Amino acid sequence: MKILSILGWSAGILAGLAACNVHQCVQAAAGPAEQPAGEYRVLEPIESGDLLLFPVVRANGAQPAETPFLTLDEGIRTGEVEATEAGRVRGLVRPRPRVGTVEQRGQDDRVFPEEFPERGDQVNTLVLVNHSDKPLLLLAGEIVTGGKQDRVIAKDRIVPAGSDPIDLGVFCIEPGRWTESSATFGAAAKGAAHSFMVQPSVRQNAMVDKDQRAVWDSVHGAIVQMNAAAAPAASGSLGGPRSVNAMNTTSYAKAMQDSAVSEKVDEAAAPVMKSRDQVLAQLRQEHAVGVVVAVRGEIVWADLFAGTDLLARYWTKLVRSYAAESLVPGESAATPTVADAQRFLSAPSGGTETSEGDVGVYRYRELRYGGTETFVLESLLPGTGYDVHIGKLKLIGAVRRIGAPQIYR
């Protein structure tokens, strides 16, 4: 990979809003501001079918000495992270010192936090607790399965180590089911090699539109396209060609787990995933911290992390989500260059800025300018004070899927 000396993109201009404790602050920025040169540089791309992945490095090679975060998949696998429906919060509450008489405490001698009164299950809220001794990093687009519906994380956030239960904003990606399949939620994939998150077009509806119906529409469209893409792969099997309704599911996660779909996703990602260790070794050597993503010649997304270690831990999950996006049919554009990818990163960030977070834990900002939107998750935990994840996307128009089942409308 060749490092080109081009003006880079800095997230530093995004600083300036004070953290807001569990509420949002919105302000109009003064206008587009040019980014300081040299913060990020784009490398020569890795080609994988209709995918083009441009690795991104910090110009000075500087990275945090350590990124002490636990990922969602790691936490669920070890049992250190639990997520459940809102109505089951009582079982997750941490023990409190015994206060009062037995009669005052009742049979359950744990004190139920006032912020979590008895309540029913909710489509767009789960309750999560981090039992580990590390802060938990959650990325928008990550999937948890089980409960009464599969869900997707709505926005990036950090959950402190040893936390009390928190309300977690989510979107349903399995319309039509509201019956419990399990008491707690699990990871979407059975193994790390097949991990995934929702593809960029679905992530956009969750992160930008923040609209459940839009998420359902995009899930429906993605499932239809997965079925269509998988049909040729299954046509040689006993029983003839595969129907576009062959999966018989409204769940995005179950669609991605379908063997024929998984085969197509792996095929789309093959040039990257077959040499995964070699690619990751090269990324580490170059001190890469993220990628700019182009699908069929159109630059659509960028994911940047605090360091190479975090990028490597999310690599499979990210690449398979990009590969799923490449299954969406469409016309191909001219192959973008390194300069095109650099311009995408270097585009001014201005317009309207929205900020929210948790004092002393994290700050999350959204900036929209022109045809792009940028999302920045900054850690405020002791010893950090840096951007943990930056997502940037090219806004695409929402398409209403005519003929979608009523549940998607």
Regions of interest found by a model, annotated:
Residues M1-I6:
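Positively charged n-region of N-terminal signal peptides that target proteins for export
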Residues C20-P135, G141-R409:
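Intrinsically disordered, low-complexity segments enriched in small/polar residues
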Residues G8-A19:
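Bacterial N-terminal signal peptides
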